[in-house]
Amino acid sequence: MSFFNFRKIFKLGSEKKKKQYEHVKRDLNPEEFWEIIGELGDGAFGKVYKAQNKETNVLAAAKVIDTKSEEELEDYMVEIDILASCDHPNIVKLLDAFYYENNLWILIEFCAGGAVDAVMLELERPLTESQIQVVCKQTLEALNYLHDNKIIHRDLKAGNILFTLDGDIKLADFGVSAKNTRTIQRRDSFIGTPYWMAPEVVMCETSKDRPYDYKADVWSLGITLIEMAEIEPPHHELNPMRVLLKIAKSEPPTLAQPSRWSSNFKDFLKKCLEKNVDARWTTSQLLQHPFVTVDSNKPVRELIAEAKAEVTEEVEDGKEEDDDDETESALPIPANKRASSDLSIASSEEDKLSQNACILESVSERTEHNTSGDKFSNKVLSEKPTPEGPEKTVDVDGPANDVNLETVAEPNDQAVGFHENGREKKRPQLESQPDTEDQQTVDVNLVGEGNDSNIVILETNTDCLKPEEDRNEENQEIIENKLTQSEEIKDIHIQTMDLVSQETGEKEADFQAIDNEVGFTKEETQEKLGKDDKTHKVVISDITSEVGTDEPPGDTQKSAEQSQDAEGGAGEEAPEPAQTLTEKATEGPEAHGAEEEPRSGERVEDKQLEQQSAVCEGEGQVTSTSESTRATTEEPETDEVDQVSESNSIEELERLGVTGAEEQALGSKGEAATELDLEREENAQELPVKAEPQAPAASQASEPPPVLIPSINIHSENTENKGEMGALPKPETILPPEPENGKGNDTDSGTGSTVENSSSDLNLSISSFLSKTKDSGSVSLQETRRQKKTLKKTRKFIVDGVEVSVTTSKIVTDSDSKTEELRFLRRQELRELRLLQKEEQKAQQQLNGKLQQQREQIFRRFEQEMLSKKRQYDQEIENLEKQQKQTIERLEQEHTNRLRDEAKRIKGEQEKELSKFQNMLRNRKKEEQEFVQKQQQELDGALKKIIQQQKAELANIERECLNNKQQLLRAREAAIWELEERHLQEKHQLLKQQLKDQYFIQRHQLLKRHEKETEQMQRYNQRLIEELKNRQTQERARLPKIQRSEAKTRMAMFKKSLRINSTATPDQDREKIKQFAAQEEKRQKNERMAQHQKHESQMRDLQLQCEANVRELHQLQNEKCHLLVEHETQKLKELDEEHSQELKEWREKLRPRKKTLEEEFARKLQEQEVFFKMTGESECLNPSAQSRGCLQTSHPSSTRAPAWAG
């Protein structure tokens, strides 16, 4: 029987192998049938080419996998079988498969639209809800088909969902899928991509006790929906290995901006992302959800049309801006100005995808102060160029912005309000410099709005110098004109776009990146109405267009508020063109010179007032707009306006008390707008931010009614970088604007901001604005602008017969390549993990096969041993019965012969006696008859005696035989019981050893994963250290140059101040100059020492952080190993308990078996005794039939004997 089973198993194995190679063509060159026409990508297991059939011209994606041996084909047969067996419009089809020269060619259906994640990266924005609905429904239908066919995909993500040009999707990549044989079958393989992995799959890394089923794909679908809504999956900032812990322990992820999405979408996600597997909906249930009740795929067709549109690229260098900057820097700098540095800054953060954001900068401006004796403090907004953060957008909050969107124009004509001793001083309006009339228009693809195509068009116009009255009169006209132009653009050019027109009277539209936070408010200022000031005019025009129902809830509100804001700006009275710049004082110590009174007869010139508004867009896109203004304070009788050049470095960051962090220098790679936060992110340091988010600044006019004024608050989130590979900053949060009320004069709202009234020495008032980040050696603004280029992309495509043109503008910097490098490294990590999982799966399959073979072998051996033992005893019993039968037959033969001989002898004697008696008594018939009867009786008695003797002998022999046979049966049963007990022990030992082998390979695989994780962590730490070293090297190289430039400027200004104010002799002046030079040398030496100490501190902190990250990683790894060992110990204990229970139950069943056997033996003995007793009572009455009767009575005993063995 066992041999038959073995043959059956072997036969089934052969059929299965034949079925696996059923769809693979062997020894045929695929290039004879398919022509390679391009390369699509490089996957984890081989390259993917675009191929075309030479006969039918059908396109295919050809995955070419190099296999070292034919055994490796087994790893890919499941994928081929699934592709070949699936016939569904939303699943890619297998077109062909070849195995040729150790290369496996898998040719699948080609989807020209590309993968969903690739489309999002191409368009640099996520999908809208209407697009997500279409993709979700078709993906659900594909999953439902797979699950009905007992297939678990196990690697569902946006990268495996492909678009066709018809607007449909197809599910692809079944490389790690599982094809079950039973509907309720569960799996315990730890496989898939970590970010999309379900919690029950994650738990299989250390415990196989709770296997998963088809609902694991439902969780992955929910994560994929979040990925499509936010470009990246949840926890994408974490290392692929470390995200597993987050998935297992944290709550189910949600949308970053829930109010931005419909309730149906949120409910659908809730049903998908349910950690309790039993409560999680199935695909068939989800198909009934109202979120997927869509029929048209038009949104996806529009998306694909835009993604596949013809792209026109235009690269612009920033050299014109550089020329302007150089011209400005050449202007003379007054030496008797004093600068203060009360600043409120919050750093913006780099966008994860380094998405496009355009940077707007304005020129330096001058201002006149006409009130003598006023105490005020200029708030200097330090700026850093932002080559990254490329798209010009306006006030977009986060990846899914749900706050009320209001456009903020950079006000160049502003009055700056400050608190001093509990009262507010009005800052004079800032004057603009005249320049040529110029206009630059940038059409920008606004990311993250959730609309189909959100476009922000920023128009930066430079007006000629006009009188105050003319400029004020033009305000409303320009607003109305821009409204009209934007409406035309909305109706004709782009259907679903947000149009924001921003017009400023700047000198030139210089692009400049900034990481500061400014709260802008409009305030009525009556001081300057009568003056002939050349104020900067600001016009804000917001138009939001809504198209169809694709716009998610919240956009309508944004649009309404934008329009209201635009109308409010247009409705202001003509004499009120200026906006008031109201900034909150920051926590901590104020800058030197804040709130310091100007000395008599001395003009105080503030530092270059650099205003910036960092605006978060899309997936954390950073859009920075900046305006550099120069304010000059003069005495009342002074009408002189001093023009001061832009400074080349940023000094005030340390003095602002805004962040406790040290400033970052801009490296040659062109770091993004938020250098401070980027350094903290890259160094994995958690540094406190002292600047609390500003409340919207409020101001009110004295006469006109209050209007809604936009206010932007941008504060960086210092995410604690715990060493995750490629951890990227989160988008900043922008607080929604609040309506202005009667509290406009109270600019200090008490939110933790304080104003320091004490004055501090400004080093002889020698324009400290010239060195803003001197200890960090910041590169000059002009140098930074020379490093950047603006890349304009124009997409033209046709949707439903309407030609649509979308223009995006992107700042191309070295940081783009850095971001791409980070993305490439992340892909490498995922690929390494995929290969590792494949190896683990293969090793697990090999171990499972080996263990199954061991179990089959031991069970086969048990069966053979049992059969051998039974056969041995059966043979002994058979021999005993055969011997007994032979003995009985011999005895019966002897008995028959004896009866015959005895009867013959007695009859002979009786015949003689009868003959003799007849001769004697011829006439005595009666006596003769009696004599004959007597003889017959004697014969019968003799024969009966012989028969009785033979019966007794037979009975003894049969009883002895039965006893011997029962003894053999007892021995046989005892041997079987002993064998069963030994088999139970051996089976337990085998299962125990197999369990240890299972956990051994799990530990081995876990250690390999830990080694890979540690290796990735070390590479990440090494990259951080190298980046810090490079940055510090650049800072050290730049510092001497900056110091030389500063020394020359300071010396010139000092000499000029001596010429103006000094009454000393030339010798005294020379001595003062020597003292000043010595002081400068000492100051520069201190700067070098401070920079060196700062660099050492940065490196030390980074190394400590790296060590902490490694320690934390090792702690997590040790916890996993400990958890695995605990599971192993628990399983071994459970196995021992199961064995003890099984042995106990077997012994309990053994007693009744013994009792039944003994009862059977007693019954056989009793039957035998009864049989011989009955046969012994029978008598042979006819002498002639005696021998036959004896034979008949002896035969049953011999024939029944074998039955007792039964």
UniProtKB/Swiss-Prot annotation:
SMART domains noted in UniProt: S_TKc (SM00220)
Domain UVR: 874-909
Record field: compositional bias (Polar residues): 556-565, 747-757, 1181-1200
Modified residues (Phosphothreonine): 183, 813, 1065
GO biological-process terms attached to the record: apoptotic process; cellular response to tumor necrosis factor; cellular response to type II interferon; cytoplasmic microtubule organization; intracellular signal transduction; positive regulation of apoptotic process; regulation of apoptotic process; regulation of cell migration
Acidic residues bias (residue ranges): 312-328, 634-643
Active site positions: 155 (proton acceptor)
Predominant place of localization: cytoplasm
PTM text: Proteolytically cleaved by caspase-3. Autophosphorylated.
Record site feature (Cleavage), residues: 438-439
Coiled coil residues, start to end: 468-492, 825-1037, 1077-1151
The keyword Phosphoprotein is assigned to this record: yes
Ranges annotated as biased composition (Basic and acidic residues): 381-395, 420-429, 520-536, 584-609, 1079-1099
Record carries keyword Nucleotide-binding: yes
Region ranges (Disordered): 308-352, 364-440, 515-761, 773-792, 1079-1100, 1181-1206
The reaction(s) this protein catalyses: L-seryl-[protein] + ATP = O-phospho-L-seryl-[protein] + ADP + H(+); L-threonyl-[protein] + ATP = O-phospho-L-threonyl-[protein] + ADP + H(+)
Residues with PTM Phosphoserine: 14, 189, 340-341, 344, 347-348, 354, 372, 545, 563, 645, 649, 668, 776, 778, 817
Enzyme Commission (EC) number: 2.7.11.1
Compositional bias of kind Low complexity: 691-702
Localization, UniProt: Cytoplasm
Family statement: Belongs to the protein kinase superfamily. STE Ser/Thr protein kinase family. STE20 subfamily.
Functional description taken from the UniProt entry: Mediates apoptosis and actin stress fiber dissolution.
Record's protein name: STE20-like serine/threonine-protein kinase
Taxonomic source organism: Rattus norvegicus
